[in-house]
Amino acid sequence: HSSLPKRLPALIKLLVSRTPDVYKPAVAHAVFPSLGAHLHRVRFKYIDNVEHEATLMNVLMAGTGAGKDCISEPINRIMADIRRRDEDNLRREREWKNEVTSKGANKDKRQRPEGLIIQEIDADMTNPAFVMRMAEADGHFLYTKLNEIDQFDALKGTGRAGQQFQIMCLAFDPGNRYGQTRVGAQSVTEKVTIRFNWNAATTIQKGRRYFSKVLTDGPISRINFCTIPEREIGADMPVYGTYDAAFDEELRPYIENLVKAQGLIDCPQAYKLAQKLKEECADFARLSQSRVYENLSFRANVIAWLKACVLYVANGCQWDKTFEDFIRWSLQYDLACKMEFFGSAIEEAQAADGLHNTRGPRNLLELLPDEFTYQQAVLVRQQEGKNAEGTKNMLWQWIHRGYALQLTVDNYKKLKFRKDGNDIDKNR
C-alpha cells in the first residue's frame, strides 16, 4: 500500500497535516464521505452519461491496535458546521416531543415541526427512523461514523435479512427508491431516495467475516476501502499534531465552496481523467487476466471520479494539476485493498473449481520470458489459477494491443514488459 503522492491537493494536504505519516493514506481516503455530505442536490455526469451525486462510503480495515481512530479528528473538523445545525434542529424536535407527551391524549397537539434537517444520524438507528430522517433531510445527505462495522445491523429492520447491505447498494445507485409501507397511523410510510455517506472501521478479520455472505452481491465494489500498515514491534508511538483554530480557519473556505454549490456541475478534467483511468484499469485486467479485478475496477473508477469532483468543487470549481496523481493513487490503493482483503474469496465464490491464489492479480506477461511458446503461456495461466482455454483469446488481445508479436504458429515475442527492460514499438 504505497505512500501518498509527493504533491497533494491543498485540501488533502491540510487534512493530513496533523496526522503521523503511517496514518496519512487512511485519512486521505476517509475524509471524503463527510466532505461529500456537504453537497446538496449537486450532480455530476459520469462517462457513461449517468448522473451521480457524491455518494461516498469508506471502510477502514486494519489490525487490532493499529490506530484506526486516526480518522476521527479530521472528520470532526469537517462535520463541525453540519453538527451545529443538527444541534438546533434536534433541540426543536426534543421540545416538540416533550410538548406532545405532556399533553397526553388531547386533540390540540402541534404537528411535527417543519424543516427538521438532521444529517448526522446515530450509528444504531432503526430502519423506520432512518427512513424518516432521510425524508426530512430534504435532499441532503445523511452521515454517520461507525466505530465498528456491525453497528450497521441495527438497520436490518425486522424484515428480510441483509437489508443493511441493500441500503449500501442503493445509496450508491443514482435515483434509487427505498422505503416502507406500514398500516398504523403512527407508523412511518415513506418512499425516499437514499443519500447516505458513512465511515466505518473494523479489524481485517471482522471485516472479511462481515462481508463474507455478500461477496458477489455488490456492497464491496461500491465501498471505498483503506487500511493502516502493521507497525513494527516496538516502534515509536506516532505523535499527532494539534487541531487548532488555524486548522479550522484554513478548512472553512473549502467547506463553504461545497455548501454553496448547486445543480449539475460540469468538470471536464475529471471526466477526461475517468476515461483515462478506465483504460488503465482495462489494460491491467488484460495483462493480469483477473476478472475479479476487472469487475471491481468499474465502480472503483466511479468512486475515484467522484472524489475528483468533490476536490474540484471544494477548490472553487478550479482544477489543479495535483488532482490527477492523487486520484490515480486513490483508485489503485482502493483496488489493492479490495483484492488483498476479498480478491481470493470472491474468486472462490465465483468459481466452484476452487482454483485460486491469495495474492493480488499479477501481470502474466511479466512472468513470461522475452520469447515464449504457446505452451509456456498456458502454463503461466494455470500457475495463476486460470484455465487453459482462455490462452488463445489472451494472446490475441496482447498482439492486438501491441504487447506481443507472433513469430511462428507457436512462438511469441514480448514487445512490452520485457526482462531486458527495452520496450519495442511494433510499428518500427
What is each of the regions a protein language model found here?
Residues H1-R428:
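Phosphate-handling catalytic cores of nucleic-acid transaction enzymes
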